Amino acid sequence: MIKKFIALFCVVVMIVTCFASCKKEDTTNKFFAYGITQMPKHFDPQIAESEVEKMIAVNTFDGLFKLDENKTPQKCAVKDYKISNDGLTYTFELRDDMNYYISGDVEDFLEEKSTTINKNVVAKDFAFGIIRALLPETDAPDYELLSAIKNAEKIHKGELNSSEAGVKVINDYTLEITLERKDSNFLYALTQPVSFPCNQQFFELTAGRYGLDEEYIISNGGFYLSSISEDKNVVINKNTEYKGNFAAIPSGVGFYLNATTLDIAEKVDDGTYDVGFFYEDAEKQELGRSVVKTELKNIACSLVFNMADKTTQNNALRIGLVSCVDISKDFENPLKSVLPSYYNVDNSKIETLAYNIDFARSNMLKAFDELKIKTLDIEIICTSEYENTAKTLVNNWQKNIGVELNGIVTVLEESDFNKRIVSDDFQVAIYSLTVDSNNPSEYLSMFTTDNEKNIMNYKSDEFDRLVKDLRNSPGNEKVVYCQSYLLKNAVVLPLFEETTTYAVNKDASGIYFAGDSSNMYFYKAQK
């Protein structure tokens, strides 16, 4: 009897063990690793500029809206909203259960200041954050996203006080925003860091250090800024007190510094990292079967002219230089539109300056006459990866134009190249224009007069009007017309397309990016 009992007991143990071993492994509460090539300079969402700065912001903050996998804005801090019949007034009813996460570092900072703050996220926090982004002293890189707000442009120029902004707090949980013009892209703007909430009391307590370290930032999203190891990594951890619709499944995400994107590619391949974006040589990296790749044609390698330079601001000169280049013959993956193909715009009716040597020569002669010169030295600056491209362009100019033109190619380290671009110390540059918005009108707005990203210093009232009209009422025909305007005026010469490769380890799921790498979301990540 005892032997039978022991035998039965062993069978039961084996069955239980079998079921236990067959139990599905828990894929939640895991830690994820992402490779970066540049450490964030700060964590202030209103002035977030780099890919990683924006990525950390969209994961640690809840804006009024959040982008889903289809790039569509979904209600986030907003419980309900309505838009007036004329499309100019937005009224948002906010959730009443949102709170800022107060980390141990922030607690220590507040204790040092002998004060406390209201953890509730209310309408005035969103109003303060948005108005901050309009102020000239904030110098928000993405101010343009909010420029349709009533009086935004005058406030940004310092012509009006911020109290005149079309942003009104009705009560703690009702916010009203009035626009000066209709903006089809406005809900998208409210998914971006530039519009995120900012607690005024905490902001003022930091005395100019807001967002510079983990103790100087509070956020209301599914993650919070946990630690910063200078020149090594940044870690965001799950906000266990979060009550919104986008609760974090993973325990946290680490952003780890690498020398090149090739290093990131190798680490995603060997499983050190879960996900990464690759550029340049990393795209050619042979990745193993454990990695799923997606390629985005989101970079337009272009020849750009500096309109602040007295020579290249001459319209005839630019037309001459552009008209003697046959991009279809000289470059692989030639691009005949200002927009990269990422946007899926029908550009079949786009108008460009055709390759025409006689036309190029006549315009150059006209330019020489207008500039009152007989010879011309013109410099193209570029980084080493585009040296051959620059030499091809110079050879075309010197061979085809037939006037006294001397093209000079100056190859620079990336840091020196960027310094010259920012300081307007260039005539012509080979520059990668990269998608940083899901909307063609935002991409095209980088050519508008007051846009922070207008490295060409191009100023055209007519083009500004065209982009505003496009934002008011979007349409393929208008997108094409805007591009044609830039191309026919030789503001930019698109040369060829480049791709960004998004790779994720096949064991990871739930990570998604809504259009561009800065809008990558980790809250649903599992492995």
Whereabouts are the PLM-identified features?
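N-terminal lobe/hinge region of extracytoplasmic solute-binding protein
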Residues: 35-85, 218
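Aromatic- and charge-enriched surface segment that lines or borders ligand/interaction sites
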Residues: 80-145, 176, 311-313
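Gly/Pro-rich hinge or "lid" segments in bacterial periplasmic/extracellular proteins
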Residues: 158-165, 172-173, 178-252, 262
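Ligand-site clamp/hinge motif
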Residues: 241-285
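Periplasmic-binding protein-like
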Residues: 308-357, 361, 389, 483-492
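Ligand/substrate-recognition segments at binding pockets and active sites
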Residues: 366-434, 500
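Extracytoplasmic/peripheral linker and loop segments enriched in polar/acidic and small residues
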Residues: 404-417, 442-506, 527
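Long beta-strand-rich cores associated with HINT superfamily self-processing modules
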Residues: 502-527
